[in-house]
């Protein structure tokens, strides 16, 4: 069985999505499937026909980061980088809900993503900053 993770990385050269545990435990391979966070290592490719798949490559570019990526950079939300793409995708899905961004709600949203470097504080701060920017931006009205 081919996994979504394999097709993204090997066939489509979308290597931002990381392979971690291969068992759906670490979240390094988190992508959006019809707007919901899924672990690409657990999704058979045959189940994604007709769906919308979002990867970290779709958030922004090296020259033009999106607001969430910029907040991660500004707040030191990435260290070794292994968890960062999955964290960004989980955070993006959370922010898209419009739910109030509290420490607890952010931590719950990223609970499926493990980070061994940061202790999560900087990640939570980055997501909160991006949420506030979106809340006050003309592009993201209340």
Label for each model-derived stretch:
Residues 1-142:
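Signature of N-terminal electron-transfer/Fe-S-associated modules in redox systems
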């Amino acid at each position: 069985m081919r996994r979504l993770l394999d097709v993204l990385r090997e066939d489509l050269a979308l290597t931002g999505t990381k392979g971690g545990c291969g068992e759906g435990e670490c979240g390094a391979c988190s992508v959006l499937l019809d707007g919901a966070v899924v672990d690409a290592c657990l999704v058979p490719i045959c189940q994604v026909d007709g769906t919308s798949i979002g990867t970290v490559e779709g958030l922004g570019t090296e020259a033009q980061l999106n607001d969430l990526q910029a907040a991660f950079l500004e707040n030191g939300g990435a260290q070794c980088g292994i968890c960062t793409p999955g964290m960004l995708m989980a955070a993006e899905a959370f922010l898209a809900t419009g739910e109030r961004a509290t420490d607890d709600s952010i931590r719950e949203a990223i609970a499926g993503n493990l980070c061994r470097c940061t202790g999560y504080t900087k990640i939570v701060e980055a997501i909160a900053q991006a949420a506030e920017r979106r809340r006050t931006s003309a592009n993201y009205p209340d």
